[in-house]
Curated annotation (Swiss-Prot):
Origin species: Pyropia yezoensis
GO terms, biological process: translation
SUPFAM superfamilies: Ribosomal protein S8 (SSF56047)
A single GO molecular function term of this UniProt record: rRNA binding
Protein's name in the database: Small ribosomal subunit protein uS8c
Record-linked Pfam families: Ribosomal_S8
Family, as annotated: Belongs to the universal ribosomal protein uS8 family.
Oligomer and partners: Part of the 30S ribosomal subunit.
Record-linked InterPro entries: Ribosomal_uS8 (IPR000630), Ribosomal_uS8_CS (IPR047863), Ribosomal_uS8_sf (IPR035987)
Subcellular location: Plastid, Chloroplast
Gene Ontology cellular-component terms listed: chloroplast; ribonucleoprotein complex; ribosome
Protein task: One of the primary rRNA binding proteins, it binds directly to 16S rRNA central domain where it helps coordinate assembly of the platform of the 30S subunit.
Amino acid sequence: MVVNDTIADMLTRIRNANLARHQIVQVPATKMTCNMATVLKEEGFVQNFEQMGEGIETHLMISLKYNGKNRQPVITALKRISKPGLRVYANHKELPRVLGGLGIALISTSRGVMTDRQARHDGLGGEILCYIW
């Protein structure tokens, strides 16, 4: 299946798997989705991920994280900000704080994908990919 917006596809698959309380979700692997998964793991939103397959059939297996006996998802919500039809950019002074710092914004900078906190610390701006809280 050909997908134009791989970032939105990844976020939708994670959102749907969270709602269904699935342990693992499969996402097509691109450089961007791998970088986003790395940041999500570093920030504690997912347990782990690994790249499977070869060539065009490469995909990521992302292990989702749940809390407590009731298995409440760690990821409450995901929201795509910059879309193919309307790109959203911000310099380091204009970077948003998600829920007063409780969530993160993923920013695509010249030094790769990072959180809004890291980009603000490094004095970098870039494209605001999504909000996660």
